[in-house]
């Protein structure tokens, strides 16, 4: 067998470790992008859904508020 360099598998080991590091880098970037997407969706829902519903609930609460009875009605 013709052998150019006697490195005892060092080149193959380095190439495999580079593949592992590249894979971990891709996974990390994907996770960071997923977290960024979650924050973007939360900001969108906050401005498009949560805030208007909160305003509608405050209007409903003020509309449904019942004033207490005057004290003169309670006197017997």
From Swiss-Prot:
It is found in: Host Golgi apparatus membrane; Host endoplasmic reticulum. Plays a central role in virus morphogenesis and assembly. Acts as a viroporin and self-assembles in host membranes forming pentameric protein-lipid pores that allow ion transport. Also plays a role in the induction of apoptosis. Counteracts the production of type I interferon by interacting with host IRF3 component and preventing its translocation to the host nucleus. The gene is E. Residues 1-14 are virion surface. Disulfide bonds: none annotated. Coiled coil: none annotated. GO terms for biological process: disruption of cellular anatomical structure in another organism; symbiont-mediated suppression of host cytoplasmic pattern recognition receptor signaling pathway via inhibition of IRF3 activity; viral budding from Golgi membrane. The lineage of its organism: Viruses, Riboviria, Orthornavirae, Pisuviricota, Pisoniviricetes. This is Envelope small membrane protein. GO terms for cellular component: host cell endoplasmic reticulum; host cell Golgi membrane; host cell nucleus; membrane. Keywords: Apoptosis, Host endoplasmic reticulum, Host Golgi apparatus, Host membrane, Host-virus interaction, Inhibition of host innate immune response by virus, Inhibition of host IRF3 by virus, Inhibition of host RLR pathway by virus, Membrane, Transmembrane, Transmembrane helix, Viral immunoevasion. It comes from Porcine epidemic diarrhea virus (strain CV777). It is a single-pass type III membrane protein. The chain crosses the membrane at residues 15-35.
């Amino acid at each position: 067998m013709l052998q150019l360099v006697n490195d005892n598998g060092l080149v193959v080991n380095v190439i495999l470790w580079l593949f592992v590091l590249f894979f971990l880098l891709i996974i990390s970037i994907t996770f960071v992008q997923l977290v960024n997407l979650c924050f973007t969706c939360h900001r969108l829902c906050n401005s498009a859904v949560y805030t208007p519903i909160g305003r509608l609930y405050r209007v409903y609460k003020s509309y449904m508020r019942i004033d207490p009875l005057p004290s003169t009605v309670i006197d017997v």
